[in-house]
């Protein structure tokens, strides 16, 4: 399966596309950074945000020399890591027009969506917290690369009117990213039905009697993908497919 984040770089330009990654320590965020590593002539990371994995965020910020950093969590972060993040921002901010920024809490994450230098925001946040980031990104006139299902499940009627132009919003989770790429250059009026694909998770083919004895450990062991705990459970129960159908309704 191709990296879903490759769709972030489908548009060619002589100018580097400057990217903010929200949820940079999660699976989609890590994949996004891998894409940037392979296309340094086309892509540049200028902002990173994570929830609680401050040490991983610091390593990423140092590697990409990022001047804008945000942590969703306000507590439980060691003083050493906080100092390291502050020092990194100070070093990198000398070359940024708007300076640098390091903040904690949801306001800080939302502010990253409005950095003047940013061209594109990858929203790989988990849960309904991603809705505000999607809204702020589109309101600021940035391209939204969306991997956060809840933005559309919770607020599709709020988000979609802000994405009026082609390319304003690019879905990069695997199912919707695949549909998006299949429809490029096609007339939507000629499409009568869309299929949202599914691996079936770890319990595909199991009999009802087997499912009565399922353990949390089994539900957390996906046969194909290494993902976060919540999305892995949603995959095991197929709850994520319900969310994806709602998301596809708004997108397409």
Segments the model singles out, each with a brief description of its role:
Residues 3-68:
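N-terminal Rossmann-like dinucleotide-binding module
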Residues 21, 71, 102-105, 122-123, ...:
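General beta-strand structural signal in soluble alpha/beta enzymes
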Residues 25, 61, 69, 121, ...:
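Residue-level signal for inorganic ion chemistry
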Residues 173-178, 220-252:
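Mid-domain beta-loop-alpha active-site segment that forms a flexible
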Residues 117-118, 124-125, 131, 135-140, ...:
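Rossmann-like NAD(P)H-binding beta-loop-alpha module
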Residues 26-32, 54-56, 125-135, 146-147, ...:
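Short glycine/serine/threonine-rich phosphate/pyrophosphate-binding segments
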Residues 81-119, 125-130:
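A structured beta-alpha segment of the ubiquitous adenosine-cofactor-binding alpha/beta core
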Residues 49-53, 75, 174-178, 195-203, ...:
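Glycine-rich beta-alpha junction loops
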């Amino acid at each position: 399966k191709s990296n879903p984040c490759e769709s972030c770089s489908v548009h060619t330009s002589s100018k580097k596309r400057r990217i903010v990654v929200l949820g940079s320590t999660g699976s989609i965020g890590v994949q996004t950074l891998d894409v940037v590593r392979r296309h340094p002539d086309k892509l540049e990371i200028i902002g990173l945000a994570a929830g609680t994995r401050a040490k991983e965020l610091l390593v990423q910020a140092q590697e990409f020399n990022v001047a804008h950093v945000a942590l969703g969590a306000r507590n439980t972060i060691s003083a050493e890591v906080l100092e390291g993040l502050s020092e990194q921002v100070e070093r990198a901010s000398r070359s940024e027009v708007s300076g640098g920024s390091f903040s904690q809490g949801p306001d800080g994450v939302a502010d990253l969506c409005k950095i003047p230098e940013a061209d594109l925001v990858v929203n790989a946040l988990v849960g309904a917290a991603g809705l505000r980031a999607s809204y702020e990104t589109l309101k600021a006139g940035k391209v939204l690369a969306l991997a956060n299902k809840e933005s559309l499940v919770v607020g599709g009627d709020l988000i979609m009117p802000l994405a009026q132009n082609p390319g304003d919003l690019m879905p990069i989770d695997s199912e919707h990213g695949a549909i998006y790429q299949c429809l490029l250059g096609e007339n939507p009026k000629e499409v009568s039905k869309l299929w949202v694909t599914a691996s079936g998770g770890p319990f595909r083919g199991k009999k009802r009697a087997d499912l009565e004895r399922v353990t949390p450990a089994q539900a957390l062991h996906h046969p194909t993908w290494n993902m976060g705990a919540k999305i892995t459970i949603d995959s095991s129960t197929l709850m994520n497919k319900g969310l994806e159908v709602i998301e596809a309704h708004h997108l397409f």
